């Protein structure tokens, strides 16, 4: 996609168990009826968009794009906000974030991080298959406990946090680069 030719919408907050919000085609029909031209599609609702299948199947991606085109829609970006957050969870936040991962890795911070990295790398592949050149995600929360500390900021803690972020994110960024997709961080302090 070179230029967005109208408004776009992030689908995540509208996904529900009831029609039309329980399928990608239902969401596409709804969004198109409201005049939207592009969808940002989250990768954490397999029944809406299967990131595993999209990473491995050009046909799946072509089918999704074709269905959206029938509704005069295109994909602006895929998003891995929750998975990106799980790449770098500060230990103080382990419990609150455990619900964002599959039960099999939810309570194991290392396995959860590795699962999230795998999803992000699949999102790079899927983005390339879909012809996308941008991807939306969060960076994690390693430094959040240090944002408003008392006594004043400890630069060593920030340096350590950002070195660790670089260590965790460089392989992911390299994968996106390999597929020609830019990562767009959406930074939230909470």
Model-derived features: positions:
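Boundary/entry segment of secreted carbohydrate-active catalytic domains
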Residues: 2-22
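Catalytic domains of carbohydrate-active enzymes, especially glycoside hydrolases
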Residues: 23-45, 122, 129-134
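Active-site acidic/histidine proton-transfer and metal-coordination neighborhood
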Residues: 70, 87-190
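Active-site beta-loop-alpha junctions enriched in small/polar residues
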Residues: 10-16, 42-44, 80-83, 140-142, ...
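Structural preference for beta-strand elements that scaffold enzyme active sites
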Residues: 4-10, 36-40, 70-79, 132-136, ...
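N-terminal carbohydrate-binding accessory modules
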Residues: 1-3, 30-33, 67
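Aromatic- and glycine-enriched glycan-recognition loops and surfaces
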Residues: 20-25, 52-66, 114-119, 167
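Glycine-rich, proline-tolerant flexible connector loops at the mouths of alpha/beta enzymes
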Residues: 40-69, 84, 139-147
């Amino acid at each position: 996609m070179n230029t967005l030719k109208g408004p776009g919408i992030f689908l995540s907050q509208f996904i529900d168990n009831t029609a039309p919000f329980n399928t990608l085609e239902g969401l596409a029909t709804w969004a198109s009826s409201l005049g939207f031209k592009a969808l940002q599609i989250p990768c954490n609702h397999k029944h809406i968009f299967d990131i595993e299948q999209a990473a491995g199947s050009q046909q799946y991606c072509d089918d999704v794009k074709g269905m959206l085109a029938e509704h005069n829609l295109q994909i602006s970006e895929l998003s891995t906000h929750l998975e990106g957050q799980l790449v770098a969870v500060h230990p103080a936040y382990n419990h609150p974030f455990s619900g964002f991962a599959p039960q099999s890795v939810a309570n194991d911070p290392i396995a959860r991080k590795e699962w999230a990295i795998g999803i992000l790398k699949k999102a790079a592949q899927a983005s390339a298959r879909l012809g996308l050149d941008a991807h939306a995600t969060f960076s994690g929360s390693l430094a959040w406990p240090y944002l408003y500390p008392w006594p004043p900021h400890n630069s060593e803690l920030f340096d350590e946090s950002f070195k660790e972020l670089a260590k965790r994110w460089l392989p992911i960024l390299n994968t996106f680069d390999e597929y020609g997709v830019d990562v767009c961080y959406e930074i939230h302090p909470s």
